[in-house]
A protein has these predicted regions:
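Flavin-dependent oxidoreductase catalytic cores
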Residues: 19-425
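N-terminal amphipathic/basic-hydrophobic helices that include classical n-h-c signal peptides
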Residues: 1-24
Length: 425
């Protein structure tokens, strides 16, 4: 009798949970409805997330890069994000990457014009790669909170001085001004993946004993300072562009930043008032990139993208660097809901958003926007097809989560299954 009563209570609780979920979904905004992002109004709530592009061999905008972003814009996204626009030459991830300088503005203007012609907005992801930067190909010493070895670049990053930190903040402000001049609608400040700001946030990497190390409040000074430097620059220009940030919820590394510390950081960023939205991400480009990507770990293919001896080292240690995490739809939602419950500002859900069901779920959970990457790499027109399908839920992504696209990030990023975006023209 007792067991029957408990079973009945369990069924009632499950039914109540389903009813609440259905009620939320019924009252949630339509992902295809227009939405405000700071001063912008996007035509829908779907953003193409920033990804490696490898389409700038001379560190300047090419027709290839323009087409790479024009395709998802024509394919229906509300906004596409150009990555990675470093704030300085030494802040690039590798030597062919674009950095924000006057010579880059005309090319960026051609890009933003092309995106606007398709009815979409366009954001520039700006940041300093810090210890992730390839000092050899950049021909500039990388920076980190402390002297730190980059296993990919096979070089040490030097400890950033106070003058270095001031310079990086000034570079972010200048990058924002150049983005405005180039016609961008938004800038996204990279605070994740153990790039410079994220490295300062990480207790594993940041072992400083000065005002930028030790307590979380000290470790967060660089991230908060960068955001406010950009905000002041944007406000001074009187520009109506949005300012967002990409923030790690967790590094996925023992000793790295966790959700509790990251949530506290997010609250500070919210209270500072410099951001119009935060895109929630995870993982470390230095130690554990698959914590962000999930799915198959393409060790053989990724190793093949490097020259010996790094190729051999990657093959021998690849299982440790490219750890395999099972894929599931909306795989960052569990952690993201912790942030949604505590923050009032707009949040962007990333990770495993591949179909209408996951988009609707994100809206029901209170997220203002969703961000997609691999699914749009595989099918740049996916959003238009989902929109045409309506609420039938009959359109699913061609992305298989094989992650072999990761092996192409240094040689024109593309989907090796569909051939897109090259074969989507």
């Amino acid at each position: 009798m007792m067991a029957t009563r408990f079973a009945r209570q369990g069924h009632q609780a499950a039914a109540l949970a389903i009813a609440i979920k259905l009620s939320r979904m019924a009252t949630a905004p339509d992902v295809f409805s227009p939405a405000k992002l700071g001063p912008l109004t996007l035509r829908n709530r779907i953003i193409k997330a920033a990804t490696f592009e490898a389409r700038t061999p001379d560190a300047l905008v090419t027709d290839d890069l323009i087409e790479y972003h024009r395709l998802p814009a024509a394919g229906g996204v509300g906004m596409t994000t150009v990555a990675y626009c470093a704030v300085s030459q030494g802040g690039r991830t590798e030597g062919n990457g674009i950095w924000m300088r006057p010579e880059a503005v005309p090319g960026f203007r051609r890009l933003t014009d092309a995106i606007h012609a398709e009815g979409a907005a366009v954001s520039a992801q700006i940041g300093h790669a810090g210890p992730v930067a390839n000092a050899k190909t950049n021909k500039a010493t990388a920076l980190a909170p402390v002297r730190f070895f980059n296993p990919i670049g096979m070089r040490f990053a030097r400890k950033a001085t106070r003058e270095d930190i001031d310079d990086v903040m000034a570079d972010h402000a200048n990058a924002a001004r150049l983005a405005i001049e180039a016609g961008f609608d938004a800038v996204e400040i990279h605070l994740g993946h153990n790039y410079l700001a994220s490295a300062f946030l990480s207790p594993l990497i940041n072992r400083r004993d000065d005002e930028f190390g030790g307590s979380l409040e000290n470790r967060a000074k660089v991230a908060r300072g960068l955001v406010m430097a950009v905000r002041r620059a944007v406000d001074k220009e009187g520009a109506r562009i949005a300012v967002t940030a990409k923030l790690n919820m967790a590094d996925g590394v023992r000793g790295g930043i966790n959700t509790e510390e990251s949530l506290t950081t997010a609250k500070w960023l919210q209270d500072d008032g410099g951001l119009d939205a935060i895109e929630l991400t995870a993982g470390s480009s230095l130690v554990n990139p698959m914590y962000l990507f999930r799915g198959d770990a393409p060790i053989k293919e990724f190793a093949g993208a490097f020259k010996p001896p790094l190729r051999w080292g990657m093959r021998m240690t690849g299982k440790k660097f490219l750890r395999e995490y099972p894929y599931r739809d909306a795989y960052l939602l569990r952690d993201a809901k912790l942030f949604r419950a505590e923050l009032t500002m707009p949040l962007i859900l990333l990770g495993g958003i591949t179909n209408r069901e996951t988009m609707d779920l994100a809206m029901a959970e209170g997220f203002h926007f969703v961000a997609m990457a691999r699914a749009l790499l595989a099918e740049p027109d996916l959003i238009n097809r989902i929109a045409a399908d309506g609420a039938q839920h009959g359109v699913h992504s061609a992305c298989t989560h094989c992650n072999r696209c990761l092996a192409t990030i240094y040689s024109r990023t593309r989907c090796v299954v569909t051939g897109a975006p090259d074969e989507a023209r």
